[in-house]
Amino acid sequence: MSIDSLWRTVLWKQFGAAIDMFDNALVACPDSLWRQPVWPASPDPAERTEFWYVAYHALVWLDLYLSGVPEEEFAPPAPFVQGEIDSNETLPEQPYTREDLRAYLASLRLKCRDVMETMTDEQASRLVEYPWSEGQPISFLELQLYNMRHMQGHAAELSLLLGQHGVHGDAVDWETRAPDDLGDN
């Protein structure tokens, strides 16, 4: 296996594991915790701390970063609103359902695997810039590592909340690598 092929495979296996851990948290979350704040801080509006919203936030940014386009050129698929990226005032009219979020995540898992497995040297080295990069463009490849860390960070937050409320076991266990097949994840 060439280093290029090895790198793409390793990147997918670890990114896929982060996505799978995130999905495990969505599946394991009881209805009683769907609107539970993940952390005590109170941004405005407070709904932005709820389990479902943190999940939505992570998915929208996962999609944007996999696309590698500027924020102003991105729109999430229906039924999701753009507000997460371009406005602090726009919230969905009601919390997204677990089914909607899992369907979006399933499509993003496929997109992620495709991006990781087909990334060329030219694509990997293409420079992208986002407001948080403070005027310092980064490579698309580095963006994907950032994206993976962002996804895993939110998977950990959601899993921690579940654990604090007595949800334990296989549903929130560590995923070491994504499986070889796409399966049901």
Segments the model singles out, each with a brief description of its role:
Residues 26, 116, 120, 181-183:
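Long, well-ordered core segments of solenoidal/helical folds
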Residues 15, 19-22, 26, 105, ...:
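Hydrophobic alpha-helical core bundles mediating ligand binding, dimerization, or RNAP-core interactions
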Residues 4-12, 95-102:
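Active-site rim elements
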Residues 87-128, 139-154:
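Acidic/histidine-rich alpha-helical segments that form the ligand environment
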Residues 2, 8, 12-16, 20-23, ...:
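Short, contiguous alpha-helical
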Residues 29, 61, 119:
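Residue-level signal for short amphipathic helical patches enriched in basic/charged
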